[in-house]
Design a protein with these regions (language model features):
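N-terminal accessory/interface modules of nucleic-acid-binding and processing proteins
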Residues: 1-291
Length: 291
């Protein structure tokens, strides 16, 4: 029996959605990082797990369901949720002509399974009981709040001008996007701005991602996916309709499907980096380095 490959399983799930014309990182619900939550803790799952679960609401493990006196409805299937477990490993190095062993911690991807609360019987449904109050701000006001907060805090320069180009320049540490009036709808303006803003978090003074890739290279594709994910979740975080914010063609879907088939770890890596980027944009939080 073939050994279970978590990366392959994750990639296949994403590919299945793309084959149906669904872009997993562009969800119809509002709230971005908070669509799917743990029933027990109330905390939202990670960005990657949001993509895998694909359905907002509360989730429980089999044990949590039985501990609450409930059961899973007949025919309902579980969903994979992944997490990183820090594992000790020994690394051999040559130091001053001597072979030395050094212990280090590395993150290893693990998984467990959960069920949506609506697929359970005998437990009290949470529904929308724990939802946060609706923001008094409009989606555009929420988006402007994000933009002003980030560019007011960071040294990155924002250029909004009449042009036909949108790009981030690492050498100048500046984001350039066409003026809002050049877009058919305001959601497209903010999805473009958030895409380039996510790129800017990769600067060496911020999250220090590899920004050296040229168009068509693997490193370029990886960074593009980080920006796509970051933009999609920021748009949703602000309460905008992601279906309006992004123009997706068959070629777009086929392009990403091809990339995922070539690299089964691509979506896992990009989602992790995008989540760090989104948190940095919203809060300035930097990930704690692994020792």
């Amino acid at each position: 029996m073939a050994q279970f490959d978590i990366y392959e399983s994750i990639t296949n799930k994403i590919l299945e959605q793309l084959a149906q014309g669904v872009i997993p990182w562009q969800r119809p619900w509002h709230g971005g990082l908070e669509g799917a939550k743990s029933y027990v803790t109330g905390k939202p799952y990670s960005l990657l797990n949001q993509l895998l679960l694909g359905r907002e609401g509360y989730y429980l493990t089999w044990k949590q369901i039985t501990d609450l006196g409930g059961r899973v409805k007949k025919g309902c299937k579980s969903n994979i949720v992944v997490f990183y477990k820090m594992t000790k490993t020994t690394e051999t190095k040559m130091v001053d002509g001597e072979i030395k062993e050094e212990e280090k911690l590395i993150p290893v991807l693990r998984y467990y399974t959960v069920f949506h609360e609506e697929d359970c019987e005998g437990i009290s449904p949470k529904g929308n009981k724990d939802e946060k109050p609706v923001s008094p701000l409009t989606p555009v006001e929420e988006a402007e709040k994000v933009v002003e907060g980030y560019y007011g805090r960071e040294a990155c320069k924002l250029n909004v001008e009449l042009s036909n180009r949108a790009f981030y320049s690492p050498s100048e540490d500046s984001v350039t996007v066409p003026a809002m009036e050049q877009y058919d709808i305001v959601e497209e303006y903010y999805s473009t701005l958030f895409h380039e803003t996510t790129h800017s978090t990769g600067h060496s003074s911020r999250l220090n991602r590899d920004m050296t890739g040229h168009f068509g290279s693997d490193s370029y594709s990886k960074e593009e996916l980080v920006a796509e994910l970051g933009a999609a979740f920021l748009v949703q975080k602000c309460g905008m309709d992601s279906a309006k914010a992004f123009k997706n063609s068959v070629a777009y879907i086929q392009s990403w499907s091809k990339k995922f088939k070539e690299d089964k770890k691509l979506i896992v890596s990009a989602a992790s980096k995008a989540e760090k980027a989104v948190k940095f944009i919203l809060t300035g939080e930097r990930p704690t380095p692994v020792k």
